[in-house]
């Protein structure tokens, strides 16, 4: 490994070949056309990218990474940041799963009623990250009970090419019934049959119930992070 700045995306991929978790994080959040630089060393790994809005996003992973400058920075949870320069935003976890074992699962019904999904999310999951009309969405899955939409979620493909779940939501009257697990499992079957081999998932750190549900499906924890916003000087 090296501790000097690396400007070639392919070189970073090669250096991370023996660290699958760092490799997956980098592949998820650092598209080649937006990549700026990375620093790889035994005690940590960091990289920065240009975001769509022109700002800079960076990640700092491990016990003692080089913290690259960024308007928004995500670090391994527990890493101390200068509170005079950065404001804590949110803590979240990244999970991942291989889809092959879901290939024979009952397929998820795919929804095209975007108005219904929009109203559902506004009522039952207002903090959803992805909404109908988002160009990254591959499809919306759904579960119904006698015609009533009771669970929905999106499979999206990010600019890195990584496929992720987003906006998994259950009707407030139908929670704790395993519907999110069922929907995600069925959607993984759809993904596998369409040639998608791995799917990721981000969860707020405090959402213990959701994390337990996804772990029961088979999702593996890739990393635990805290995001920070750079304060105006």
Q: Residue locations for each model-derived region?
A:
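Short amphipathic alpha-helix that is part of the acyltransferase structural core
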Residues: 1-24, 91-128
């Amino acid at each position: 490994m090296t501790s000097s700045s690396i400007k070639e995306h392919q070189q970073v991929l090669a250096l991370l070949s023996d660290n699958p978790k760092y490799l997956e994080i980098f592949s998820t959040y650092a598209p080649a056309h937006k990549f700026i630089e990375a620093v790889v060393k035994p005690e940590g790994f960091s990289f920065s990218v240009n975001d769509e809005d022109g700002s800079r996003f960076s990640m700092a992973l491990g016990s003692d990474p080089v913290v690259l400058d960024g308007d928004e920075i995500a670090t391994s949870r527990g890493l101390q940041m200068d509170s005079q320069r950065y404001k804590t935003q949110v803590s979240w976890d990244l999970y991942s799963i291989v889809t092959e074992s879901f290939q024979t699962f009952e397929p998820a019904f795919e929804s095209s009623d975007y108005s219904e999904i929009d109203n559902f999310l506004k009522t039952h999951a207002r903090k959803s990250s992805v909404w109908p009309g988002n160009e990254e969405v591959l499809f919306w899955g759904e579960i119904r009970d006698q015609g009533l939409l009771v669970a929905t979620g999106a499979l999206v493909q990010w600019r890195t090419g990584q496929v992720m779940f987003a906006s998994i939501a259950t009707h407030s009257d139908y929670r704790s019934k395993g519907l999110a697990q069922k929907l995600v499992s069925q959607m993984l079957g759809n993904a596998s049959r369409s040639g998608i081999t791995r799917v990721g998932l981000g969860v707020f750190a405090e959402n213990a119930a959701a994390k337990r549900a996804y772990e029961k499906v088979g999702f593996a924890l890739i990393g635990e992070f805290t995001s920070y916003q750079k304060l105006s000087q």
